[in-house]
Amino acid sequence: MVSERSSNQSHPLDYYMNNQSTDHHTIAEDLEIQLTENDKQRIKSISEQIEPLNHEGLLKYGANLQQKMSHFSHQILDDVQSKDMGPVGETLSQLMGKLKSVNPNDINPEKQSRLKRLFKRTKASINEVFSRMQSVSSQIDRITIQLEKHKDQLTKDVEFLDQLYQQNKTYFDNVTLYILAAQKKKKEILTETIPQLREKAHQTGNQMDIQATADMEQFVDRLDKRIYDLQLSRQIAIQTAPQIRMIQNVNQALAEKIQSSILTSIPLWKNQMAIALTLMRQRNAVSAQRSVTDTTNELLTQNASMLKENAIETAAENERGIVDIETLKTTQNDIIETIEQTLQIQEDGRQKRQVAEKELNELEKDLKQHLLAMRK
């Protein structure tokens, strides 16, 4: 069904995925329409392998194909479980974190918030910013290497899943042929074999002929159940197809996201940081030039002011005498006041001594009187 189908002829699984509303009856009809001559010959050959009343052969009919499909399902499950997408998401998150850790606005104080300027130095050294950018850039380069490995692995996974999808198509085609072959054999038994057995049993009335008819009817019932089992296997193949495509799409989206980050986000970040650093240097140069101009103007203003003050003070000093009249007056008043205070102090001392002498005489007289009184 696959090898001989023309390139412009859609595979039933592809048609099913693009037309989710298609029912099983329509799919079956499409399968019959798309059968090639080789498919019809294979159906005939497989149908002839079914021996009526051979229950062991019926049990093994299509079993090998179902075992391959079971192994195929486990293969898909193992592949999904072994490919943990967690590290990919973590690596992308790390990349976004590093890209956000150094923002061009952080370098430009004018674009920082008032609160941020309050708790952070207004101006950062160019060397500090450049060193920080180099450190982050090195970390981003290491993350980029990891992302490249993830992207390569995801690309390989997409190719591997595409191979699994093609295998699933092959399983679908084969199980469909087995179903059609079993249905062909069932129709042959119902329309030819059983009517012949019934006619023979009716004519002979032999109990063994009647039992042979019943056995054949039981065989048809078991054949019908086997067909149903194979239809379930085909349904698994139908459901597996969109699951494989879904995993492929997720892997492809992640690979594209990684490639976009490597080829777009990272170069854009580096360009913006280079531009921000250049603008910072320009701003610092303008600030330095402004500082030189302001300092020059300030020095000229201060020198002119000092020259004016010195000229005025020098002229005033030249007009003054060696000793000011006011100074002489103050000095003379201080001398006179000192002499007067000295004379007053001497007079006060003299008076105090006279009073002390009188008190001493009184004390001496009092002592003598007490001594005389003690002798009597």
UniProtKB/Swiss-Prot annotation:
Transmembrane segments: none annotated. InterPro entries: Toxic_anion-R_TelA. It comes from the Bacteria. Belongs to the TelA family. This is TelA-like protein SE_1089. The lineage of its organism: Bacteria, Bacillati, Bacillota, Bacilli, Bacillales.
